[in-house]
A protein has these predicted regions:
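A short, structured surface patch at a secondary-structure boundary
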Residues: 101-160, 166-172, 277
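Bacterial Sec-exported substrate-binding components of ABC uptake systems
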Residues: 3-6, 18-111, 214-247, 369-406
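Alpha-helical, coiled-coil/dimerization segments enriched in small aliphatic residues
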Residues: 256-286
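Short, solvent-exposed loop/turn elements at domain surfaces
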Residues: 90-92, 107-113, 131-137, 250-255, ...
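Structural recognition of the beta-strand scaffold that forms the well-ordered cores
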Residues: 100-102, 124-127, 150, 166-170, ...
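Short helices/loops that flank or line small-molecule/ion binding pockets
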Residues: 155-163, 184, 289-299
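Short helix-initiation/N-cap motifs at beta->coil->alpha
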Residues: 87, 145-157, 194, 282-292
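Extracytoplasmic substrate-binding proteins
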Residues: 79, 176-254, 278, 287-289, ...
Length: 406
């Protein structure tokens, strides 16, 4: 047998021992292992988080409220209590998120609620917010088509089906609609919104509901300053004798009606420096029909015609061509006017009553309002209340103006 030389074997053993005792490579503190990258990529984020900036932009607001965002909702709200128009204490653990506006002529409630930018997100159902000449809420709320539209006579069952956490109602509906809703355990807040004083109070209530008290205070200041400016301007002026007549031709029968003493039309006349002649007769709780003989007997200095469902300019032109109306002194002297409005007439207890007051005062006392500019007033109103810019107002609101505008 051939024997192997011991020298090669010895050399192999020495080589193996040297390899096994060599020091391992040690990295300095913080250095990455050789087989790894210096900063491994983070785990893949969900798509929404990949583009997130340290200070994300606020969500885009509907066009109608972009400029009305200085009063953001606080990130968390404590329980709060609201006192409504009936003096009821309504408690909320959190701000309501599914609000329903119901009842007839609800556009007056809706227009007031939408003063608050949060309304578009929080209101989930309402009745028809139009008055025969358009729907303002549909213009300014991009989500209007996604809301449930209730029938004008919707009952508690239809309203409850929307699963509201708050229903806003005019106070006169407390017994007929409010009580059944309360029985179902649905919170109800009642609002009046019938007089300037009630507007001041009820806007504060809406400010509490939408967690925007500063917004309510700012709008109340706007209203109050406008009223004070008009009152100061007409102070000491001779009061013209005024008639405000609501025109209707239901079923082809023409009728003229005067409002109660407590209604907005009467209040506006007095605030604007006029004498409302209809206060001389016995008035009911609603519109009171008067004859042409009574209208003639009043011998008004200025007559204002209201028409909710027909172009008021057409109505006044028709009356001016009527021989019986031509015999009236106000008509002969060119003092028969169609009450101004846009999508809604400005005589009503809607948010636009302040536009009606300014317009009426300028018609009754033009010498006291030489700088009155109806277009400027309209633009300021919609900017202040709804954050609508001039381009929007020029395109969507100005073309709807009606009545006898200076």
């Amino acid at each position: 047998m051939k024997r192997l030389s011991p020298l090669p074997l010895l050399l192999c053993l020495l080589f193996l021992v040297a390899c096994s005792t060599a020091p391992a490579a040690v990295s300095s503190p913080g250095a990455a292992p050789e087989a790894a990258t210096a900063y491994p990529p983070p785990p893949e984020l969900p798509p929404a988080a990949q583009a997130e900036t340290p200070y994300p932009q606020p969500p885009e607001l509907p066009p109608a409220t972009q400029a009305a965002t200085p009063y953001p909702e606080p990130p968390s709200a404590s329980p709060f209590t609201v006192q409504d128009a009936l003096g009821r204490q309504v408690q909320f653990s959190t701000p309501p998120q599914r609000i329903v506006i119901a009842g007839k002529a609800l556009f007056m409630l809706a227009d007031a609620a939408y003063i608050f930018p949060q309304a578009g997100q929080r209101i989930v159902a309402m009745g028809n917010a139009g008055q025969g000449t358009g729907n303002f809420i549909a213009l300014i709320d991009p989500q209007y088509e996604q809301k449930a539209i209730l029938a004008g006579d919707a009952g508690p069952e239809q309203i409850a089906a929307v699963q509201p956490d708050l229903v806003l109602l005019k106070s006169y509906l407390a017994e007929s609609l409010g009580k059944p809703l309360e029985t179902l355990g649905i919170p109800v807040v009642y609002l009046d919104l019938e007089t300037p004083e009630q507007y001041q109070r009820d806007l504060v209530t809406l400010g509490q509901i939408f967690q925007a008290p500063e917004r309510a205070a700012a709008i109340n200041t706007y209203y109050r300053q406008n009223v004070e400016r008009v009152q100061q301007a007409v102070q000491g002026a001779e009061k013209p004798k005024v008639l405000i007549l609501q025109y209707s031709d239901k079923d082809g029968v023409v009728a003229f009606n005067v409002p109660p003493q407590s209604w907005m039309q009467t209040i506006l006349t007095e605030l604007a420096g006029g004498e409302p002649l209809w206060k001389q007769i016995q008035l009911g709780k609603g519109w009171t029909q008067v004859s042409l003989e009574q209208i003639a007997a009043w011998e008004a200095d200025k007559i204002f015609i209201i028409s909710y469902f027909r172009d008021v300019s057409e109505v006044t032109q028709q009356l001016k061509q009527d021989p019986q109306w031509q015999a009236l002194r106000a008509v002969q002297q060119g003092n028969l006017y169609g009450f101004a409005g846009d999508l809604y007439s400005w005589d009503q207890p809607d948010v636009r009553w302040i536009l009606g007051l300014n317009w009426l005062a300028a018609r009754l006392h033009p010498e006291r309002f030489p700088d009155y500019d109806v277009l400027q007033q309209v633009r300021q109103f919609y900017q202040t209340l709804y954050g609508l810019d001039e381009a929007f107002v020029n395109q969507k609101i100005i073309p709807t103006l009606r009545g006898d505008l200076p």
